Amino acid sequence: ATVLGLDSQADAREIRRRVDYLPGDIALYDQMTGRELLKFLANLRGGVDWNYVEQLAERFQSDLNRRIRKLSRGNKQKIGLIQAFMKRPELIIMDEPTAGLDPLMQQEFYALVGEVKAEGRTIFISSHIVPEVEHICDRVGIIREGELATVEDVHVLKDRALHQLEFRFAQSVPPEVFANLPGVRDVVVEGTTLNCTVVGSPDAMVKAAANYEVVGLSSREASLEDVFLAFYDGDSPNAA
């Protein structure tokens, strides 16, 4: 395996120099203050720009003078975020990075991620909060039953995977004509309007609709959560 083009075993020391990590279940030295802990970690990593550490603490509204054992879950998470960002590593690996953060601090985290991306650095995030992933990530991997089901740019996966379609016909149509088409699901007919979800290409659905008088057609962009659920429902949204 390689990380940043380096062999994960032969180049382990160099990888550690260029990578930082935030675990999902963060464990800190409770007897230390936030400042003491960050200085300790900074020394282990060969020193950091302490002015940048102070800027991060200000952004996350983190009191570095309090003992860690007295901090709430969210405030401990802030310390974890600061230690992950403070070295300005090329790659940051994070597991559930916004756990325990209030909405304002989540937005601050998203802004910081945007700045890191703009600098050409990489953040690898594991998260169950699908809207968060959609908001901040360029590429996404979906794991299903312990295996990597797909890796795609977010916009490509959304465009290719799911289509939310609404057809308006001149008269009511039989839903069973459409419900059995490949990739078509959740067919609902109300009056002369038909709504459905299409996994993969909508070609079969469009051709079937052409057998009736269509007076209107609209589509809604699928969310990443829609795509995620499609994988776990057993569909195969990778079909082009």
Feature annotation, model-predicted:
Residues 1-144, 148-150:
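ABC transporter nucleotide-binding domains
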